[in-house]
Amino acid sequence: DVYKRQDAYIASTEKNLDINICPYIEANPETEFIIFFPPYSILFWNDVIMENHLDATIEEYRYIAERLNAYANVKVYFFPDQEEIISDLNNYADYSHYHPKFNRYMTECFANGECLVKKEGEEGLGAGKTIDEYLAHMREIAENFDYEELLLRRG
């Protein structure tokens, strides 16, 4: 199954970035772009696990972060591993649309550097973590979360 492959999403993601995002970044070098991965609910990650797409999804996140962080005028932020947000289904209208109050939290992070994905060579400097650190934490959450208990509570 193609979706079980670690690189299953890379070609389509690369094409999407090449067409829809990177040209605008490159055409506007004086503009700072803030790109963020949103905090999809744990139900999104349940689907990823059930469909055996975890490796491909993790690699897609890694590819996007590394590709965009290569630009001097881009800052990338990572919110998917905010367990206290993503594990509370009351924070969501559905599995990807979170409560508007989290927009304020994210903009505060943009200002203070929390949840920043560090660029290559910035390890150990200031706020934020490397994409590998964020993804390792996200993998840990996705693989170890008690989905059955959550779904029983919601039932």
For every predicted segment, state its role:
Residues 2-3:
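Short, small-residue-biased leader/transition segments that mark boundaries at the very start
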Residues 6-11, 50-52, 92-93:
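Second-shell loop/turn segments in exported
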Residues 9-23:
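A Trp-anchored, charged/polar loop motif used as the substrate-binding/catalytic surface
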Residues 16-20, 59, 63, 101-106:
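Extracytoplasmic/secreted proteins, especially bacterial periplasmic and envelope-associated proteins
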Residues 25-51, 78-82:
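Active-site segments of SGNH/GDSL-like serine hydrolases
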Residues 44-77:
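Substrate-gating cap/lid alpha-helix
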Residues 72-88:
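Acidic carboxylate-rich catalytic motifs and surrounding loops in phosphoryl-/glycosyl-chemistry enzymes
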Residues 91-141:
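Histidine-centered active-site loop/cap adjacent to the catalytic His
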